[in-house]
Design a protein with these regions (language model features):
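Structural beta-alpha unit
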Residues: 1-5, 45-48, 59-92, 99-100, ...
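Small/aliphatic-rich secondary-structure junction motif
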Residues: 2-53, 59, 63, 137-183, ...
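Amphipathic coiled-coil/heptad-repeat helices and related helical stalk/stem segments
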Residues: 23, 76-77, 107, 151, ...
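Short, hinge-like loop/turn segments at secondary-structure boundaries
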Residues: 56-59, 110-111, 140-142, 185-188, ...
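Conserved N-terminal glycine/acidic-rich loop preference
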Residues: 133, 150, 196
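Structured core of small recognition/catalytic domains
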Residues: 165-235, 247, 252
Length: 268
């Protein structure tokens, strides 16, 4: 079982867009799951009108009206990133989308910068709901590291609380990965890769949620997005080790800063 206290402080990136209540409601759900303290971050002036809007939203969602609100000035994304650093936020929650073109949801600028420049965990919702829908299917992109193992434990913890149907643990293998492995004399059969991935999962011990391992092959890392859509996943989970590449996305997953196939949880 994972230690939910890893997320002692959760904050929601606040705007007064038509979907603000929905994003705040999703954040409340996550707060309840992890037993965390929830605060709000707002880039703008602390006026009576703004305070009344926050008070109304908190009241509508049965959240404490004395919840902390961290005010910042300037560029929205930069302000949110400053507040995260200043107040030691463990997990930031935000709406993901700016627009949708040809059925591909494109990340908004704030969400993109939180994912790209942030040093904490990020959870982005593509279609937040006032009454949050259960997260039935998870896809976890695995790497073989202690950080990824801890991230998978945390993922399974949330999946169990959500009474999820299945967690897919996948390993993305691109054509470039295979060519590099062959050059280094590390080529292996698909069955070997799946056995290694299965062992990675089994090493966690007792698992309360149905779990399935898959090795996904393709020309680029975008094959992961195709898989997410094929299984109709509700949450894509990506472990980003702060000790590697400063916790940034690996090259084969950089497409996530542009296109997001479903709700996304980046665990740092």
């Amino acid at each position: 079982m994972a230690d939910p206290s890893l997320y002692r402080t959760i904050a929601v990136a606040s705007t007064f867009s038509p979907r603000f209540d929905q994003v705040l409601s999703e954040a409340k759900r996550v707060r309840d799951r992890f037993g965390s303290e929830l605060s709000l971050i707002y880039v703008g002036d602390n006026t009576r009108e703004v305070a009344e809007k926050f008070s109304g939203a908190l009241r509508r969602l049965s959240l404490p009206e004395n919840s902390a609100i961290h005010y910042e000035q300037g560029d929205p994304a930069a302000g949110i990133l400053r507040a995260i650093e200043r107040h030691g936020i463990d997990l930031i929650i935000a709406g993901a989308l700016e627009k949708e073109i040809v059925l591909h949801p494109f990340l908004g600028n704030v969400a993109r910068r939180l994912l790209r420049e942030g040093r904490n965990s990020v959870m982005l919702f593509t279609n937040p709901q006032r009454e949050p829908k259960p997260l039935r299917k998870f896809v976890f992109i695995a790497e073989y590291s202690d950080h990824a193992a801890k991230a998978l434990r945390l993922t399974l913890y949330l999946a169990a609380l959500e009474k999820s149907d299945r967690v897919y643990v996948i390993r993305v293998i691109t054509t470039f990965d295979e060519a590099r492995a062959a050059k280094d004399g590390r080529g292996s059969h698909e069955s070997d890769e799946e056995a290694k991935l299965e062992q990675f999962v089994l090493a966690l011990g007792d698992i309360e949620v149905p779990t399935e391992v898959r090795c996904i092959r393709g020309n680029t890392g975008f094959v992961a997005a195709d898989f997410v859509k094929s299984v109709e996943a509700d949450l894509l989970v990506v472990p980003l080790d702060p000790q590697k590449n400063e916790g940034q996305l690996p090259a084969n997953l950089e497409w996530l800063t542009d296109v997001i196939p479903c709700n996304l949880w980046a665990i740092r």
